[in-house]
């Protein structure tokens, strides 16, 4: 992985009681040792693979103002990180879920793009076996489950300040207002809505195939084609490019997909991030509620699975063997 660290700072927030978060600040930056680079590379990999929300700085953002000064050389990175950690502590203290943790600020370059990554990481306890086959306690940073993370694409921010996607952050776990306090700390508002873009794409694809008067099998083949392209982009960490997708769909209609989408006013960006959960709807139907969970391939609708909208009834012909076995045992009085 071609990742180069410019500056990296680490501080700590310790929760002493329900009201107070103690601030522990380093007096120097971390050295970019091999271990440190490996840790940042892992954090970059994990973060890049997760679904993120997109944002942009408000005009009043204190973090943006101090970051701009730091980028101009008017403040060093350590001082910037120490002041920002203090503001993060003040913001976190407003919320009852504040647990503290290690606060990481890392300015790094990956594939010619400069980033500033800000994360609050937890230290977890575990066990390890040493060379004598003894079991000893150990601690590790829980990078895989970090949910208080934001990343600023410094290159995009400085070259295209009107962009709505240079800042990304994780939404956090359900029931925790992680996004709320982090947006307040960053002084940012939500920008590009990736889910809305993906939903718009799905609607455009359905309308495109309908206008081309394709039969059911042909429509499903197009959906599978779109899903395959989008999933490849997702796996590669690339965005969905409308022009590239349109070339994939050449021959479906006399009108190109990009022309169709522009003419019909779907307001799709030229490129946007893929959203895994939304894209699954191209090939599957899924839903849950009231103790019922259903998931099936879209091609089965109208063949083995039938929906009557008048009665809201789903009829399934031919159940999976393991489900059928459970039903037979239960109805025959078995366990």
Curated annotation (Swiss-Prot):
Belongs to the YejK family. InterPro entries: Nucleoid_associated_NdpA. GO terms for cellular component: bacterial nucleoid; cytoplasm. It comes from Shigella flexneri. This is Nucleoid-associated protein YejK. It comes from the Bacteria. Pfam families: NA37. NCBIfam families: PRK00378.1. It is found in: Cytoplasm, Nucleoid. GO terms for molecular function: double-stranded DNA binding; single-stranded RNA binding. Its main location: cytoplasm. Keywords: Cytoplasm. PANTHER family: NUCLEOID-ASSOCIATED PROTEIN YEJK, PTHR38772.
